[in-house]
Amino acid sequence: MVTLSLTPELLAKLQSRQPLLWVNPRLGQPLPASAPSLELIAAAEARLARCAPLMAALFPELASSHGQVESQLMPATGLQYALGEGAEGAWFIKRDDQLPTAGSIKARGGFHEVLAIAESIAIEHGMLDPDGDRRVLATEAARKLFSQYSVTVGSTGNLGLSIGVMAAALGFDAVVHMSADAKAWKKDRLRKRGVRVVEHEGDYAQAVAAGREQALGATRCHFVDDERSALLFFGYAAAARHLARQLAEAGRVVDAAHPLFVYLPCGVGGAPGGITYGLKALLGDHVHCFFAEPVASPCVLVQLASGSDDPVSVYDIGLDNRTDADGLAVGQASHLVSPLMASQLAGVFTVPDDQLYVQLLALKTSMGVEVEPSAAAGIGGPGWLRDSPEGRAYVRDHGLDMRDATHVIWATGGSLVPREELHRFQAYATALAHVPGAMHKAA
């Protein structure tokens, strides 16, 4: 068993699945020399903008947004008061659960990578001028070209939906390797879109490894590597500028006297890591990003707290990576993201499965918003800062005035979840509410 430099107290809490807030002691240190250029964020923004007409042509549900894949920033005063947080600061929900077509945060990175692949192939074959109209990628000639290529990914569910739907829409042979904890409805939805789904008995890492292995032995096959992909990462990072605009439109200033806190559910780390990277590049020390991970799967926490440059997994400390938050059921953090988050991430808090349902129910009853369990992981973030010794110390050490703070809780998925599944989530959460002590807050 690997313990590395985890303190005995932290290790004991992790192994006993005790909810906790870990504050990153390396926040604010320089990025590693190998860090990707921030110019790649602008490149991703530009790609998504020039492909917007193509997206509107491919997906009728994007017509009203002119092909922009973006989500609402929703005031969350109802949730704030339902959880007894008082009036300190302003709360918002970032509604990536409503992102069109893919229904989750994974649309940001997944769509961006598939669009980049399609552009590259079309330019290489003389079908697309570098400055040309991207709607040519939706023509029959383009579909015939793309059908000669496959796009493969390994996923617990939501990234597979994103990649599979986008690749199939363009005519690629789309293959999604899915882990044992992937939900049946996600597999069914992909198959209905013409995507080949390969099921595996192992966990997320094994599904990714299987996809990578298939791609190595194939010609004209692009493997979307959730653990290492820069194209995914910068697709997520491109969300930062739009969020900044939304905050400005809501009258929320972000500066030294008006700090911004962002709470992001975390699986392998690509989506929350990319968004954090983009926000820190844009807003610097004025934004404080925290990841939320299941108590059974705190892979980024374990990796960063270990202080090791070598991969460390939750299995190394005796955890089993079994959680109802299927999108967050990842045992080992991204090899690309972890070194970057070592200096950018404020901290990580962990959430038991029952608490996910408690928070899911609070969101439903206070605001009428229905999400899947993993998407509710970030809701406890403000409470950790207010109520825990670690959170209060973070606020004090950074000289933050919480009265004028803005809190953004990122809801990562849920709009595509079948109605019967949503009812099951709510029923279980309601039953929990009648169990003594079940409604306590994680902090």
Swiss-Prot record:
One of its GO terms (biological process) is D-serine catabolic process. It comes from Cupriavidus pinatubonensis (strain JMP 134 / LMG 1197). The keyword Isomerase does not apply. Its EC number is 4.3.1.18. Disulfide bonds: none annotated. Belongs to the serine/threonine dehydratase family. DsdA subfamily. InterPro entries: D_Ser_am_lyase, Ser/Thr_Dehydratase, TrpB-like_PALP, TrpB-like_PALP_sf. The modification N6-(pyridoxal phosphate)lysine is found at residue 106. Gene3D superfamilies: 3.40.50.1100. CDD domains: D-Ser-dehyd. It comes from the Bacteria. Its cofactor is pyridoxal 5'-phosphate. Keywords: Lyase, Pyridoxal phosphate. GO terms for molecular function: D-serine ammonia-lyase activity; hydro-lyase activity; pyridoxal phosphate binding. SUPFAM superfamilies: Tryptophan synthase beta subunit-like PLP-dependent enzymes. This is Probable D-serine dehydratase. It catalyses: D-serine = pyruvate + NH4(+). The gene is dsdA. The lineage of its organism: Bacteria, Pseudomonadati, Pseudomonadota, Betaproteobacteria, Burkholderiales.
